[in-house]
A protein has these predicted regions:
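Active-site bordering "gate/hinge" segments
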Residues: 1-215, 364-366
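Short, glycine-/Ser/Thr-/acidic-enriched flexible segments
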Residues: 58-60, 103, 171, 180-182, ...
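A short secondary-structure junction signal
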Residues: 64-67, 107-112, 186-188, 229-232, ...
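Short solvent-exposed loop/turn micro-motifs enriched in small/polar/acidic residues
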Residues: 157-159, 227-229, 264, 293, ...
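Long, well-ordered mid-to-C-terminal structural blocks that present hydrophobic/aromatic surfaces
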Residues: 208-263
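Active-site lining segments that contact anionic ligands and/or coordinate catalytic metals
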Residues: 213-215, 231-233, 240-243, 266-270, ...
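Dual-mode signal for accessory low-complexity, basic/Gly-rich regions
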Residues: 245-314
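Extended hydrophobic packing segments that form well-structured cores
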Residues: 319-366
Length: 366
């Protein structure tokens, strides 16, 4: 299909978590500090400004039981290799899309009561519904959905909120925004006018908060699957934009490694609004997959921000982006914080508040 669409060249790369597990289990220490061929390929591709389609087919527990020190060291070294080269993709300068496909480890973790064949069939059915493929006219369904998201991101940008207030079980948080916030989501457009959807499915409208303006406590409402490890029942305490305390019922060591990665990994780079009435949330699943979990409910990302979520941000240098409050990190980890019990209000310059999310649903009409 890519060639039929006019591509000059198509490169297919396979990444296997079992190979990574073998690296950490049997490789020498140097293997956990080496730059992988995968990272070299990605860095080269990003530098060349290629479009890419990533098929996320991951076992959320692929690296369970592996020494987090070895995994964390590998993550840090390899993230640093691709970080600068990835800047154009984070700035939405070239088209890219992430989708997901079932693999045994993933389907069995989501549907543990079923045999593999039944679990796989159920997963494909859920994916088709979440991606609106089951609709009589999927293309028209997507056009309608993207138009709704576009109206909502225009509304939120026009309101010029200075902060977001989160309230829910275990959550009492204020996240300050930058001085010129822009909300994005759904279909986005490159500077050359090429539209694309970074995520399929997509239910979110998001912005990048100010890196120094978060305070309070927030609790995750779903597990975070990160590099083959599962972090569960976790929370953050924020002060002056930084995580100053945290805890987890499972995967606390992995969480600690994420937070300690660099100067921006313990700060927020994204705040996204997602309603519980969306097509992903309607499945009622704990997906254990970042793409699906982040489009299931509101989320906040640790780490790197999106320059396009600041007015004129794409044209700023890295130092200028930092100066206006856009966070920078080799990490971008989406933490799901929304549910039917969580509400988010936008704070206006005069201190008054307006509902954005009320008990998990949109609190405004766009």
């Amino acid at each position: 299909m890519a060639y039929e669409g006019g591509a000059e060249d198509v490169e297919v790369q396979w990444f296997d978590a079992e190979v990574d597990r073998s690296r950490f289990t049997h490789g020498r220490d140097a293997a956990s500090r080496a730059v992988s061929q995968r990272s070299r390929f990605l860095a080269s591709a990003f530098e060349d400004g290629v479009s890419y389609l990533r098929v996320s087919a991951e076992d959320p527990a692929a690296l369970a039981g592996i020494d987090p020190e070895r995994v964390g060291g590998f993550m840090k070294v390899n993230n640093e290799v691709v970080f600068e080269a990835r800047a154009g993709h984070m700035a939405l300068e070239v088209p890219w899309t992430v989708i997901a496909a079932p693999v045994p480890g993933w389907t069995s973790s989501v549907f543990p009561e079923d045999d593999l064949a039944e679990a796989t069939e159920r997963m494909w059915s859920a994916i088709f519904r979440a991606c609106r493929i089951d609709q009589p006219d999927p293309v028209e369904a997507w056009r309608t959905h993207l138009a709704d998201l576009a109206a909502r991101k225009r509304h939120l940008t026009d309101r010029r909120y200075v902060a977001l207030r989160y309230r829910g079980p275990g959550t009492d948080l204020e996240v300050g925004l930058t001085d010129r916030p822009v909300w994005d989501g759904g279909s986005v457009t490159t500077p050359e006018g090429r539209p694309f959807c970074p995520n399929i499915p997509t239910e979110e409208v998001f912005t990048s908060p100010h890196r120094d303006r978060a305070s309070g406590r927030i609790a995750a409402t779903k597990p975070l699957s990160y590099f083959g490890a599962l972090i569960e029942d976790f929370w953050f305490e924020m002060a002056d934009g930084r995580v100053v305390d945290s805890g987890a019922g499972g995967g606390a060591d992995v969480l600690a490694r994420i937070l300690a990665t660099d100067g921006g990994s313990a700060r927020f780079g994204e705040a996204a609004m997602v309603p519980q009435s969306g097509a992903v949330a309607a499945e009622g699943l704990v997906w254990k997959n970042t793409l699906y979990d982040e489009n299931d409910a509101c989320h906040i990302a640790l780490g790197s921000s999106y320059p396009t979520c600041f007015e004129g941000g794409a044209a700023l240098s890295p130092d200028e982006r930092l100066a206006v409050g856009l966070n920078q990190s080799v990490v971008h980890a989406d933490v799901v914080v929304g549910s039917s019990e969580v509400s988010v209000h936008g704070v206006l310059p005069d201190g008054s508040k307006e509902p954005i999310i009320l008990a998990g649903e949109w609190g405004f009409t766009a």
